[in-house]
Amino acid sequence: MAVEGGMKCVKFLLYVLLLVFCACAVGLIAVGVGTHLVLNQTITHGATPSFLLPVVIIAVGAFLFLVAFVGCCGACKENYCLMITFAIFLSLIMLVEVAAAIAGYVFRDKVRSEFNKDFRQQMKNYPKDNQTASILDKMQKDFECCGAANYTDWEKILAVTNKVPDSCCVNITHNCGINFVVKDIHTEGCVEKIAAWLRKNVLVVAAAALGIAFVEILGIVLACCLVKSIRSGYEVM
C-alpha cells in the first residue's frame, strides 16, 4: 500500500512537471520566433549561426511539447515503453540545449559581425527598394535608433548632408529628417541597440534554460521511478 501510495505521488508530481514542460515549450517557441523575426529583417538568409540558433530554440520548444505529450500518455496508461521513450527524449533535449548554449557563446561575435555587415548592406538598398526602406524605417522607429553605428552613416548613403530618414526623428513628421537638429533625432546606431536587445533576451533564455534543465532532471528521475514501478508490476505478474 505504501509503495502504491508512493507511485501515486510520483505520478502526480510527473503530471505537474509535464504542465511546466508545456509552458516552457510555449515560452521557448515564442522567444525563438521573436528573435528570428528580428534577425530576419536585417541578416541575409542562409544557414548561418545567426539563423540556426533561433531555429534550434524553436525546434527544442516544439520537441519538448511533443515529449510532454508522450510522457502524459505514458504516465496515464502506465506504459513501460512510452515512459522509457519519454526519459530518453528528455535526455536528448538536455544535450541539444547544452550544445545550443555552447554554440551561442562561441558564435556571439560572428553574429554581431554579420548583423553589422548586413544592416549596412540594407542601408545601401534603402533609396532604391521600398520594401527594404519600410523594414529599416520600422526598425528605427521600434528601437529608437538611426543608422548602423550612428546617424552620420546616412550621409554616406543618401549622399546629402544634414539628412536622415524621417524614421530617425524623435517626433516623426513628413520631411522631419531634412535639415534636422541633432537633439530632434535618435543618434544611437541600430546595430548596438538591437545587439543589446538580443543580449537581454539571451540572458532571459539562459536563466529559463537553467530552470528548465532542473525540471528536466527531476522529470527524468520521476520517469525512471515510474518505469521501475511498472517493471516491478510486470515481474510480479
Curated annotation (Swiss-Prot):
Q: Where is this motif: Lysosomal targeting motif?
A: 233-237
What ranges are annotated Cytoplasmic (topological domains)? Answer: 1-11, 73-81, 224-237
* Source organism phylogeny: Eukaryota, Metazoa, Chordata, Craniata, Vertebrata
Does ATP-binding appear among the keywords? no
Q: What is this protein called?
A: CD63 antigen
Which Gene Ontology BP annotations are present? Answer: cell migration; cell-matrix adhesion; endosome to melanosome transport; pigment granule maturation; positive regulation of integrin-mediated signaling pathway; positive regulation of receptor internalization; protein transport; regulation of vascular endothelial growth factor signaling pathway
Give the species this sequence originates from: Bos taurus
Q: Which residues lie on this side of the membrane: Extracellular?
A: 33-51, 103-202
Q: Where are the transmembrane segments?
A: 12-32, 52-72, 82-102, 203-223
